[in-house]
Amino acid sequence: MNNNEWGLVTIPANIDPEQRAIARLKIASEMSLKNYGTPLVVTTSGGKDSSVCVEMAQRAGIPFEVQHNHTTADAPETVRFVRQEFARLENLGIKCTVNYPTYKGKRTSMWGLIPQKLIPPTRMVRYCCEVLKEHGGDGRFVCTGVRWGESARRAKMRGIFEKQVKDRDKSVKVHEDGGSLEELFAPCKLKAKHIVNPIVDWTTSQVWDFLRDSKVPVNPLYECGFDRVGCVGCPLAGKKRYREFNYWPAYEKLYICLLYTSDAADD
């Protein structure tokens, strides 16, 4: 692997997906240390893709931290799994941090946001993601488990390396391992959030094959038949959220209660 200071990222074309992901992480780590003076931040949601990224960072032999954004709407099993994983990683000397959401300068939650927004999250109005899931990371180089295979939108909108700014039209994405990093990491751009998605081109089958072969700990909800472990009742889950509400009825009651509260506030 050869990485020119502001030029092309060169990763051999004939390496396997695991080694390719590790190579991407090493490039991101080098850029993080060089430009920010801080280790790469590996984010974890408690899902399978995050588990792959944490394991890959360990195999890459790079310095890194792990951060989790506490959404307040995750399943209890997910919260416990993240705590257990953080305890395991901290025993290995890896710094782990839980970030709590804020809104207008104050701590908040999904259940605090809905009354302020006067509407629960919908497929078209997902204010919750920005506040609860995507906060943090400014001025740092961040690793996520985003994959193109998750949705057509992600296949179109996400890259291997990214520079994210508030005006998304001005964001920069590198979609190929031979892409230039010059625009991505120009000194004037360092206040943006920089992201590496090392397994962005992996399939779901590749993710599960890696986890099983490597015996990496995974969220126990997968063993219960769930294929996603995000926020309970997320509108993007479609009809699957009704199964989630059956499994965790307290969440459905909260949404319904706050929905009626919001309606009453409009009257």
Regions found by a protein language model. Name each.
Residues M1-S262:
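Nucleotide-activated chemistry modules centered on ATP-dependent adenylation/adenylyltransferase
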Residues D263-D267:
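A short, hydrophobic C-terminal helix/tail in secreted or cell-surface proteins
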